[in-house]
Amino acid sequence: MPNEAFENVLLNQRQFFYTNSNSNPIYQSDVYLSEIAGEDQSTMSLPKFAVVDMDGDELPEVVYQRGDYMGFIVLRYKDGDIYGYDVNYRGLTGLKKDGSYSTSSGASNTSVGKMRFLGELFDTDVKFSSVEQETVSYYLNGTEIDEVTFNQLWDEYEKLPDVDWYEYTESAVKEWLPHYFEAREAAISYEYHSTPMQDYLDSLSDLLYNDYSAHGDNTEDEYNAIFQNSYDGWDQAMATIYTLCQDKLTGSAKDVLEAEQQQWLDMREQMALNTPIFLVTDMTKMRTYDLISLYFEDHFYD
């Protein structure tokens, strides 16, 4: 059961499969939490943990917050095993009870989204964002918006209730994990918990591995080849799920989808004229996630 598996990992009685996609190449290994937490001894603050459903599948994850500026490890239960995903400290801030969080790579490069799991990797499914190039642009679901709308969305996000953080102690682990899981166990079959949508997302994991291969010491030509390959892959993935949505929908719902998709494609074409290809690729990936949610009737942001 997840409660026992998470407890054993948090108390260093069991290894988990750890992925650090920030390293190059991607680092993956079976480890004890103490092997990673041992790197955090210089921090002034104590580690904490929270329990929250990060991806909306009704099965909570456990988020282990390392010390100051040390980042996070998101622990996920799948098929009887625990998987751990390393997230840098600016990649998961302001975590809310609905799984929303913010990321930042600079004062004017900020996004708010939720987490998607693709195989043994994770990604942030961005709801809205600000992107600084020569000027700052703002986006909602991949469509450009104005600064006023962005600020309204940000205010709404900040008003969401924060997750409850607990000090990382043995007594707290044993007290609070059952609190989150026992009530759910009667309603959900945890042993091999999955959904058709999750299986579909997992089938796209190779595309995400390719994206992360750009985190390295490459020549300009190598970077361009990686980015183009990534764009081509996500563009094909988007086209595939769009066709599935077309086949599923009928009547006015199908008409609305087709109009929205054409509008989105026109916007992407215009944006690509003066936007780096990796940003256009990110937009395409986010549109793919939106279409996946539509096809599987997943209300990810409701």
Q: PLM features: residue spans?
A:
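Acidic/hydrophobic-patterned starts of short beta strands in beta-sheet-rich repeat architectures
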Residues: D55-Q65, D98-S102
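Acidic, small-residue rich beta-repeat scaffolds with periodic aromatic anchors
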Residues: M1-T19, S102-Y192
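Beta-propeller blade termini
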Residues: S45-M54, L92-S100
